[in-house]
A protein has these predicted regions:
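Membrane-anchoring hydrophobic helices of lipid-metabolizing enzymes
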Residues: 1-104
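Non-catalytic C-terminal accessory region of glycerolipid acyltransferases
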Residues: 6-9, 163-281
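Catalytic core of membrane glycerolipid acyltransferases/transacylases, capturing the structured
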Residues: 55-77, 85, 100-159
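Short, well-ordered coil/turn elements that cap or connect secondary structure elements
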Residues: 85-87, 125, 146-148, 175, ...
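Generic preference for hydrophobic
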Residues: 92, 106, 130, 237-239
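Short acidic-hydrophobic, aromatic-tinged amphipathic segments that line or gate anion-handling sites
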Residues: 92-93, 152-155, 245
Length: 281
């Protein structure tokens, strides 16, 4: 379903157009109302898309982003409100347990490139930033908006560069700039099953001393095929647990990774879990 404000505003403009065209006094002109409604709705969507494209030219990705852009956050949330309901129906559980005060590290399995959109839709008030592979910065529009939302880019082939990204995440949390979302598997695997974790990512929570929000996603891997068929995908997002700092105090990152892996694996079921090693340092 499209956002209410978009539907209502289109209805108001269509009613005004119908009134000016005399549709309410002449029944033969009632066709003006639905045509005006659809036309105005499309014009708003096209105009908004054009604005997003034009504004992206003002974004300099070479300039360090020291804080979250409220304006870009607002635009991103509007895009998510507009696009996500058109392509997926989200069935979410546990959203009431998301921390309301303070920052957190959110971890989840990773199935498709649009996984972040699910969390933006489910937790619009949580001010999320996403750890992403550096190649995504080159994506049309998305790369520039990621920069404004302080999304740390990680080089998965260079351990030293990856460490810098981890330290950046820790600083974002400590400075209370945003909550961080990371996918511990590091990759989207072809079989779409849960694979081993890169346990170093849990250093982010340990060093920043923040809760770890454990989530799972299901069915986002079908989005691409269903979009082509103009079919909505039923996506399942489950918040399994919120692990407080005192609960993981004294644990190594491997132990913590194994605990979270087990939690996700049990929820997803054996058919969605790889049989390989659980976590790697």
């Amino acid at each position: 379903m499209l956002p209410i404000y978009l539907l209502v505003s289109s209805g108001i403009f269509a009613a005004v157009t119908g009134l000016l065209a005399g549709s309410f006094s002449d029944l033969s002109r009632l066709w003006v109302l639905p045509v005006s409604y659809i036309g105005i709705l499309l014009l708003q969507i096209i105009g908004f898309s054009l604005f997003l494209w034009l504004w992206s030219f003002t974004i300099d990705t070479e300039k360090p982003q020291e804080k979250d852009s409220k304006f870009c956050r607002f635009l991103t949330n509007r895009v998510v409100e507009l696009v996500v309901p058109l392509i997926m129906k989200i069935h979410a559980t546990g959203t009431e347990n998301i921390p309301k005060d303070g920052r957190f590290l959110l971890v989840s399995n990773h199935l498709f490139d649009l996984d972040p959109a699910v969390f933006l839709r489910c937790f619009p008030k949580s001010q999320l930033t996403f750890v992403s592979k550096r190649e995504n910065q080159k994506m049309f529009l998305i790369g520039k908006y990621m920069h404004k939302l302080m999304c740390p880019l990680i080089n998965r082939e260079n351990d030293r560069e990856a460490l810098k990204s981890i330290l950046r995440c820790i600083q974002i949390l400590k400075d209370d700039l945003a909550s961080v979302v990371i996918f511990p598997e590091g990759y989207i695997h072809k079989d779409r099953k849960l694979h081993h974790f890169r346990s170093g990512v849990f250093k982010i929570a340990q060093r920043a001393n923040v809760p770890i929000v454990v989530c799972t996603l299901q069915n986002t891997q079908y989005l691409k095929a269903n979009i082509r068929r103009l079919k909505r995908t039923h996506v399942y997002m489950d918040l399994l647990d919120v692990i407080q700092p005192e609960q993981y105090q004294g644990m190594t990152t491997v132990e913590l990774g194994n605990q979270i892996y087990e939690m996700m694996a049990q929820h997803l079921g054996p058919e969605n879990v790889s049989t390989e090693e659980r976590t790697i340092p």
